[in-house]
């Protein structure tokens, strides 16, 4: 069981176009491929890595905080899917389990004591082989 690198930052926005324009035009990230989720958004890449995920909340009742933006969660690459589930349960933490459309990525979501959402991403092929 181990924890890997920070994979991406997720930002909720009520102005997706301006947000994409800033991060691509001003900062130099690249707007790229994104799974076919049921909600609108964009994935921005640095090289081959989707380091920023944007979620468009303009058509919802949810509002992004304007002070610093609205950072939704922090994500890490991980391995040991079943071990993490057992450990989190054993420590009394509730978690949510998800599979990304296409099935190549398994995820666990858990909140820290401050309410910050932590996303753990597991390569499904590696987990099945373990």
Language model feature labels by segment:
Residues 2, 85-86, 90-130:
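Vicinal oxygen chelate
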Residues 1-17, 71-74, 126-130:
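N-terminal beta-strand motif that seeds the catalytic metal site of vicinal oxygen chelate
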Residues 10-12, 45, 75-77, 111:
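Short hydrophobic/aromatic beta-strand micro-patches
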Residues 8, 52-53, 73, 107:
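Histidine-centered active-site/metal-ligand motif
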Residues 67, 73-88:
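Mid-chain, well-packed structural core segment of small domains
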Residues 12-51:
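Core segments of cupin and vicinal oxygen chelate
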Residues 5, 38, 70, 104:
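Exposed loop/turn and edge beta-strand positions of beta-sandwich/beta-sheet ligand-binding modules
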